[in-house]
C-alpha cells in the first residue's frame, strides 16, 4: 500500500513539473516571439497592406532607416543577391523582456515579385554562402514563396542580411514576363512596443491612466512598480502597473495629468521600409543588343579601313 502511494506521489509530481514547464515555455515564447517580423505571419495573411504599409510597423512604432541593394537587371533562372541593410549604433543596449539590458536583434521581411523565390542550396555559390552565414530564411506562407522573413538574429553580426534569390524563367512559368518589377523590404532593430494582441511591452512609454495625486509607489519584488493615483475631486483610486526595466519620471505626492508619461522612453530601436526595382531581362534582347553593338563596331572598323584605303589612293595619284 505504501509503495503504491509512493508511485502515485511521484507520478503526480512529474505531471505537475511537466505542466509548469510547458506553461513557462508557452508564456516566454509568446512574449518574445511577437516582437519580430517573422511572427507577423501569425496575425496577417499578407505583410503589406493595401496602403503600402508593412504590418511590422504596427508593433515597432519608431521610424528608422532601412536600405536594399539588388542588381538593376537579372537573367531568368539565375541566382542573385538582395542585400538588406539595417543600420544602427552598435553601442546601444535595449531593455529585454526580463528588465535587463542587452544587445539589439534585427529582423527583416522581403516581398519579391511573383515567381521570384529563395534560391535552393545547390544553386548558391560558396562566396554567397559565406555572406549569408548561418541565417535561416523562411517563407511567409507555404504558398507565398516570394515573401521571405528572417529574425530575430544578432544585430551586431547581421546588420546586413544577404538573401539568395532565384529569378524565375518565363519559359517554364507562363505567369512571369520580361518586365520591370518592384521589390519591397521592411527591417527592424530592437524589440517592439506593442504585441499583436494590443498589449504593451516593457520597451515603450507608460502614461498615467488618470489624473490626480500619486499617493503611493510600490516597488514589486520581481521588478516593476504599482503606482496608485488618487483623483482629488472624488477620491477614486487608480493603480497603474509599470513592468520591470523602466525608469520612473514621477514620485510620491506629485500631481499628474491624464496621459502624462510615468516613465522615460526606453526604446532605442525601430522599423523602416523601402523598395527597389529589378528588370527580368530577356536573353534574346541581350544577344540582339550585343549583335547590334558588334555590328556598329565592325562598321566603324570598315569605315576607318576604307578611309585609309581612299587616302592611299589619293596620295598615289598626287605622286603620279
From Swiss-Prot:
Q: Name one GO cellular component term.
A: chloroplast thylakoid membrane
Amino-acid positions noted as binding heme in the UniProt annotation, renumbered to this chain: 36, 56, 59-60
Q: Name one GO biological process term.
A: photosynthesis
For this chain, one GO molecular function annotation is: electron transfer activity
Q: Name its cellular compartments.
A: Plastid, Chloroplast thylakoid membrane
Q: Which N-terminal stretch is annotated as signal sequence?
A: 1-35
- Membrane-traversing stretches: 286-306
Which PANTHER family does the entry mention? CYTOCHROME F (PTHR33288:SF10), PTHR33288
Protein name, as recorded: Cytochrome f
